[in-house]
């Protein structure tokens, strides 16, 4: 699937992928990169191989702003199987215990209520978190349990969509760093029977939704111009910052890394999406630091050369 590096193009933008089941996020990214023959690509948050759903892929200069999506809230739809605990917290693991499921919808709703808001989570052993330079899952596969510190995360939304007496489908909106596998397992323990995930689908990240994404198989059927037409501009990653336009005489200085005069009242350390006034083109991010100047902090290289 690889193409010679010399033939890859400098192309900028964001492509929303619907990651399929049983491939890694990196494999999905590399496939998208290959389909667009892009020189540079990066994603904005890893999905487990068994998880599906929204995976924003940043190409070219858009990779400079990918961290803003890493920090964004995420939405998921998950299926939780109660009464069965596995080593990994999902269907890939070996069964370690089975207990009867002896609760109804009312008790389940009450348990879910306890997990809304700020909660404490212990990261799972089967995760990419590192300990002494190695991911935790390598220790787990070797049968080694590594102590992990609990971390605070926020569950902004936790809604029960369906329950058949054994499995429940839940809709979750959470802050970064939340492990949905751990959430499902913890809900099961709170109900006295344990649980694991049988399905997980990311439905949202930042301001993007799964409805806007594209399947890799569909992209393969398109020609290159049609694929390029699906790219979103880099500034979609930073739309949560206020917009600011600079006059042409200031934009040159700004694009060469020099701070420019800024007299607008705002909070100290406020960041702005910066555009050239005449062309309306996005050039990068600037930061007001309370010194009467706007400092460039992240610029599009292709705009600096324009």
From Swiss-Prot:
Signal sequence span per UniProt? none
Superkingdom of source: Bacteria
Keyword Repressor among record annotations? no
Q: Which residues form the active site?
A: 48
InterPro entries, per database record: PsdUridine_synth_cat_dom_sf, PsdUridine_synth_N, PUA-like_sf, PUA_sf, tRNA_psdUridine_synth_TruB, tRNA_sdUridine_synth_fam1_C, TruB_C
- Biological process annotations from GO: mRNA pseudouridine synthesis; tRNA pseudouridine synthesis
> Which keywords fit this entry according to its UniProt record?
Isomerase, tRNA processing
Catalyzed chemical reaction(s): uridine(55) in tRNA = pseudouridine(55) in tRNA
Any one GO MF annotation of this record: tRNA pseudouridine(55) synthase activity
Q: What is its EC number?
A: 5.4.99.25
Q: What role is this protein assigned? A: Responsible for synthesis of pseudouridine from uracil-55 in the psi GC loop of transfer RNAs.
For this protein, the record's HAMAP family field holds: TruB_bact
Q: Which family does it belong to?
A: Belongs to the pseudouridine synthase TruB family. Type 1 subfamily.
What name goes with this protein?
tRNA pseudouridine synthase B
Organism name: Chromobacterium violaceum (strain ATCC 12472 / DSM 30191 / JCM 1249 / CCUG 213 / NBRC 12614 / NCIMB 9131 / NCTC 9757 / MK)
Classification from the root reads: Bacteria, Pseudomonadati, Pseudomonadota, Betaproteobacteria, Neisseriales
